[in-house]
């Protein structure tokens, strides 16, 4: 895997909106001020503040912003504002050879999973599953999230063990065991959307990381059955399931009543595989979000309930 140079004070961050537009432009303004106060320079993409239907700007405009940020010599890192919807629309319009030849830090989560998968597959670049740029302000960015983000991007050393954000949080070992392998994945919905396309996730002998938000257990069941039928669960060396925000049974209409939990679903699909599987670390949607370098080697110990990044994500 190719690695970008570490993020240093004085570096310039290019901001793009590959998916949904920000609900409020003030989010981008506040985030820019926050990053500048920390000592970084910030360049907002030409089309970040546009809106077209479900997305921020047209497919061509959103892709052009990303290609431009990677091409510009004065840009050191590329931050996505947020997820939402629409990243998959532009993955066939990115210049992957350009990205390979000019590796830069690329961050984002949720819907940005489509870009992570595509960039890793066609450019071989380590990217970072991390909070969106629009979250960067004193009110929304927890100390846990901030420390993990700037340490992982700013220090050319392994991030080490990703720990619980609070002693009150719980972790569940779906199945015990230990494995060491590169980590791949992201938001489960987008992982499934990659199947059958040139950008399909490769889970062979890798730790599959996934999380999701607002997905009822039956929706998670649907996604995992899809991955099982595609052979991806059998391919994986182990499973790291992050925090799944609001993935609980909703109120059902008469005739469709179910109290099956997400943990029930995870156990049903993953326990029979007899591979290490750990659920509950703060990677995903929530108040606390650890930054995960995708593509680097990690150690999953489901017996001790630990997940450790063994390789630096930057140089």
Language-model segment annotations:
Residues 94-119, 126-133:
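Short, acidic/small-residue loops that bind anionic groups at enzyme active sites
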Residues 77-88:
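N-terminal glycine-rich "phosphate-gripper" loop used for MgATP/nucleotide binding
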Residues 202-262:
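Internal helical hairpin/lid segments
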Residues 124-190:
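Conserved anion/nucleotide-ligand pocket segment
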Residues 241-315:
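ATP/nucleoside-binding phosphotransfer catalytic cores, i.e., glycine-rich phosphate-binding loops
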Residues 22, 26-27, 178-213:
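Conserved beta-alpha junction segments in alpha/beta enzyme cores
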Residues 74, 100-105, 123-125, 236-237, ...:
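A short helix->loop->beta-strand "cap" motif at the edges of active sites that frequently abuts
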Residues 1-74:
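ATP/NTP phosphate-donor binding region
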